[in-house]
């Protein structure tokens, strides 16, 4: 069981953010989302929006639907055969599930970083260059080089890899591989970055590095992160949504959720009474 239930534990790398959530219009607006696996309903009528330039954490006990909900945001559930999503997800006013939307393009606008780092079996350079190439984002080799460098810099990896760009991505450490995957997502100019427990396969030092990076990236992107760690949610997010049994129980500023939750179920979860 995950024992990491307290936001203020010793050794926290960043202090819990006390910033108020931004008032900007939502980057993604989800209305009345219902998700089914065959006849089983995994998400029940969830309405939730995600602002730009902020990190929103999705927390809740195992099986409560965090990953299922996250996957709705870039239509990754389309790839699961018996999965059906109902409701509206608006991005810039357009429903992402509309037939006219190309899911491949959508996934470049809404990038995703997974639990286990999953670099392509290619060089460090090609891991980053692949997306810009297929999306036609570079008009010359110099352009592509510049995108690769900028993405690696933004992901805080450039200094560590600049002299071995032709080495395989898989030759990097786990934490470096996860930053490579973040750089790969950034390279196609996303507006939103989804992270599904991005640190769960990493040691504390690599985790701290990724958390610092998330804090840096939120100045530019709308970030949604699923995490089992209360400490992590408190450290990196400005807003937190608590899920239970496929329902959204409470959503608010991270500080409020952890210090003064409105719902008893939220309080029970964050104080470690269940989950
Ligand atoms: N591919 C699938 N087919 C059928 N049911 C699924 C599938 N994926 C998830 N589920 C079910 O949907 C529910 C929500 O699962 P989900 O993985 O979204 O929860 P979670 O909160 O992310 O869990 P965890 O924290 O353990 O990763 C669970 O009951 C799970 O068994």
Swiss-Prot record:
Annotated ranges, domain ABC transporter: 28-270
SMART domains: AAA (SM00382)
E.C. number(s) listed in UniProt: 7.3.2.1
Gene3D superfamilies reported for this sequence: P-loop containing nucleotide triphosphate hydrolases
Lineage: superkingdom: Bacteria
Residues binding ATP: 60-67
Protein name: Phosphate import ATP-binding protein PstB
Organism per entry: Hyphomonas neptunium (strain ATCC 15444)
């Amino acid at each position: 069981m995950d024992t990491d239930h307290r936001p203020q534990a010793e050794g926290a790398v960043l202090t819990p953010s006390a910033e108020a959530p931004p008032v900007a219009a939502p980057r993604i607006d989800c209305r009345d989302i219902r998700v089914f696996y065959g006849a089983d309903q995994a998400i029940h009528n969830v309405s939730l929006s995600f602002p730009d330039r902020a990190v929103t954490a999705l927390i809740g006990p195992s099986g409560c639907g965090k990953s299922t909900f996250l996957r709705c945001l870039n239509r990754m559930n389309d790839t699961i055969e018996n999965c059906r999503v109902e409701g509206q997800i608006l991005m810039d006013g357009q429903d992402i599930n509309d037939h006219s939307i190309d899911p491949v393009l959508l996934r470049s606008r809404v990038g995703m970083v997974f639990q286990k780092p999953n670099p392509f079996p290619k060089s460090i350079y090609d891991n980053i260059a692949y997306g810009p190439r297929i999306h036609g984002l570079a008009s010359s080799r110099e352009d592509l080089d510049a995108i690769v460098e900028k993405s690696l810099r933004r992901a805080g990896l450039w200094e560590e890899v600049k002299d071995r760009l032709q080495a395989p991505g898989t030759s990097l450490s786990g934490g470096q591989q996860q930053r490579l995957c973040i750089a790969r997502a950034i390279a196609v100019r996303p507006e939103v970055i989804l992270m599904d427990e991005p640190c769960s396969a990493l040691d504390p030092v690599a985790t701290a590095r990724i958390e610092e990076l998330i804090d840096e990236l939120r100045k530019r992107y709308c970030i949604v992160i699923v995490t089992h760690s209360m400490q992590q949610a408190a450290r990196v997010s400005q807003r937190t949504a608590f899920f239970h049994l496929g329902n959204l129980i409470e959503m608010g500023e991270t500080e409020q959720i952890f210090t003064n939750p409105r719902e008893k179920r939220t309080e029970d979860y964050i104080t470690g009474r269940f989950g």
